[in-house]
Structure formats: structure tokens, C-alpha cells
Amino acid sequence: MVKKTAREVTEDKTSRIMNAVALWASFYRANPQRFCKDYLNVNLKMFQQILIYCMALCTNFCFIAARGLGKTFLCAIFCCWKAILYPGSLIVIASKTRNQGSLVLKKIEQELVPRSPLLRSEIKDITINQSVAKITFRNDSVIEVVTAADTARGGRASLLIIDEYRMVDKEVLDLVLKKFLNYIRHPGYMDNPKYAHLAERNQQMYLSSAWFEQHWSWDLCKDYFVNMFDTTKNYYCFRFPYQMSIKENLLLKSQVEDEMTESTFSDIRFRMENEALFIGTTDGGLFSFDDINKQRRIIKAFYAPNMILNNKAACQLPAKKTGEKRILTVDIALMSSKRRDNDATSI
């Protein structure tokens, strides 16, 4: 038997280590739910396992979730999975405000890092303040937060996440944020002409609660739902109402029941925020919401005199413009209701 030199022993050991790394990386890429359990020490609910598995498979993902379902936490987990297993990933989280997007990074810093020593060893630096929100990994992956505004131009991303996308301006999304995806992650195998054609597709994800059907967010949700049935595309669209939160013990049923009995309870708001339903025109309605919404011009509301006696700021009614006509309309509810006042008064 020929004895190996010290160099051959070292190379053999390195080769075995790298082969093991490649094997486990392939396994965890194909099974992100197992990565969460083994690497991040997070036990996901069944619906969360399904969601994160589909997030890993798709190129386009839309998730309409009820409040309290934990979409920010799930987004934080997915970002860590992507950053660790795909070195050099540029992950951008865009939202209407920087604080909203920073919640994902805070979930990583405050909840995931303390429970996973392995994740802690992967992270090089965490910076979260008023001007910068970024997590840098030792493998050159970066998770960064940007404000969804025209000033965000110039960014690049292999994964673009729009948090509460219904609050983002459509023009900013199309002309600024989507242009971030003009970037291709360049792993080492891309330098080999044999594998140069195996470039990875970038991903874009839209997370939000529901809103009105006249809004562009509903059109995007419908498009993703239709494309999900096209076998030539990798689209996924999910909607989970508050019943899922109750089923998985993320929300107490009694809490929802108490909310529904309060005098300030809003049926429309509840359907959007808790049932994850987009609200459209009521059947038989004379005017659609879009028809009325396009005519809204008043920024500051008019208050009844008996409501503003102790509030001088509210007493300052908007000045009447030249040629302006003000019409008072009253919609009287013909059926009595003890729970709420269905009358509507507008100017």
C-alpha cells in the first residue's frame, strides 16, 4: 500500500469536506423546510412548510395574508435560507416606509440569530438604523431594505421582496423597483462554458393584506393566480384568512369574537385585514367604489359644529375656491339597525 503524502492527505480531506458541503447544500436547497428545522432550529407549522417550499420553487410569488399570520417571520426565514445556500445573493426588501421593511431584519436579529449558532456564524455584520438597514453574510450575500420611492434607483437584486405591496405606488414599482432585477447571480460554474447557459432566474415576491378590487394590487393577485395554472411558468399565489391563524394557535378565537362585538368594529376592514378578501362593488350598487374614489378632492374633512367646540384646529374649514360648488348629500338607511348607523352623509 502506497503511503500518501501530507499534501495528498490534505487534498483528500478537503475534497471530502467539499463533497459533503455540496451534498447537504443540494439537499437543503430542495428541502427548505428541513433547513429551517436542522439549521435554524425553527419548527414550522404545516402551512408554513408548504409556503416556504413553494417560495423556494417559484420565480414569482404572491401571498395575501390575514393579520397575525406571521408573514414577516416567514419572510425572514426565507431570506436566511436564500442568503446562506446561494452565496452572493442580493436580497432587497422594499416597502412604503423603511421601518416597515426593517421588521424583517429585526426578526432575523432578535428571533432567529439567538436560537441558531449556525446562523450566527454565517452573519458578518448587522446594521439597522434610520438611514441603513442591512445584513451582510460571510459568503457575500446581502439582505438590504430600501424605501419604495423614486430615490431608490440604482439598486440591484436577485431576490426582490415587496412588503405590503398594496401601499407601494405602481409607477415606482414598474419604473424603479423591478429594474433591480437586471442582475444575475454569478456562481463559479458560470465561468465554465459547459454550464454558462444554466443562469438562475431572479425572484420577485409580493406580500400584503387585502385591499379594494379597484386597486392595482388586486389585478396583480389575479394575474399570479391565473399564471399559477400555467405549467410553463413558476408562479404561486396564496391567500390565508384568520381561520388559519386560529387553527395553528397563532390567534385566539375569543380575541376575534371580542373584536367583532366592539362598537368601532368595521365589517369592511375586518374582511380585508382578517379574512384576506379584496373588497369590490356591492351587488346592485348604483356607483362603484372606483367611480366615487376618482372624484375625491377634499383632503381635510368637514366636522359638525357640535364635534369641534373644543378643537380649534378642526374649526378651520377648507377655503372655498372660485367657482366651487358644495353639495350636501344624505343617504338615509330605511331599515333600522341597533348595532350601527347605516346612514351616510357626504359633501
Where are these regions (language model features)?
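Inter-Walker segment of RecA-like/P-loop motor cores
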Residues: 107-158
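Pre-P-loop entry segment of helicase/translocase ATPase cores
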Residues: 1-60, 320
